[in-house]
A protein has these predicted regions:
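N-terminal strand-loop-strand
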Residues: 2-53, 82-83
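Conserved hydrophobic/aromatic beta-strand scaffold that supports enzyme active sites
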Residues: 28, 37, 107-109, 128
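Active-site segment of metal-dependent pyrophosphate-handling enzymes
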Residues: 66, 79-116
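NUDIX/MutT-family hydrolases
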Residues: 54, 107, 118-153, 175-178
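Charged phosphate-binding loop/patch that engages nucleotide di/tri-phosphates or the phosphate backbone
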Residues: 151-180
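Conserved Nudix-box catalytic region and its N-terminal flanking loop in Nudix hydrolases
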Residues: 34-75, 172-180
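Short loop segments at secondary-structure junctions
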Residues: 31-34, 41, 111-116, 131-133
Length: 180
């Protein structure tokens, strides 16, 4: 049983009640059975681990437009534009309580068009991974990202659903999102 603070809240909840949010978006680029990951270096939030091909925090004017955020991040970090990719789709939205803030991550997937030049990033080192290798021997990744990749490889890549994930201390619980 979790200990409750004197206020009746669980540890960490007192800051969440202030409404602090961190909205982030990530894009996983694919080509065939390979996925491009970024070994991010020098980030204030996620550093020295593998992350999406491109991603970051929402700008004020993007708060209601995750697609605009990810296209901006894609261009800023790799020089690629929407014309260099196909099938850009929001597939996962995750929520995690971390350091007193709710971290909402919007995970997009897209295919890189054939014939693209070598991709470089100003945020770290890009590396292609076979999706099966990611499952068998995953590199160091942010908490929700590792569960998104696992779910995508096992289930998500075979559907066209949007999934919501709630992070717990032991994993991420995913459910299909439906419009109603």
């Amino acid at each position: 049983m979790r200990k409750k603070m004197q206020t009746g809240m669980h540890k960490g909840q007192e800051k969440v009640m202030d409404g602090k949010l961190r909205n982030m978006a990530g894009l996983y680029l694919q080509q065939g059975d390979r996925m491009l990951l970024l070994y991010r270096i020098g980030s204030k939030v996620v550093s020295d681990s593998y992350t999406a091909s491109a991603g970051g925090h929402f700008e004020k004017e993007e708060l209601n437009d995750a697609r605009a955020c990810i296209l901006r991040e894609l261009y800023e970090e790799t020089g690629l534009t929407e014309h260099d990719i196909v099938n850009l789709t929001l597939r996962y939205v995750t929520v995690r309580l971390k350091n007193g803030e709710l971290r909402q991550n919007y995970y997009f997937f897209a295919d890189l068009k054939d014939g693209q030049k070598e991709i470089v990033s100003n945020e770290g080192n890009l590396e292609w991974f076979h999706i099966e290798k990611l499952l068998k021997n995953p590199p160091e990744m942010p908490f929700t990202a590792q569960y998104v990749i696992k779910h995508y490889a096992e289930i998500g890549k075979n559907t066209d659903m949007l999934y919501a994930g709630i992070a717990t201390g032991t994993g991420v619980a995913f459910t299909e999102m439906e419009e109603f």
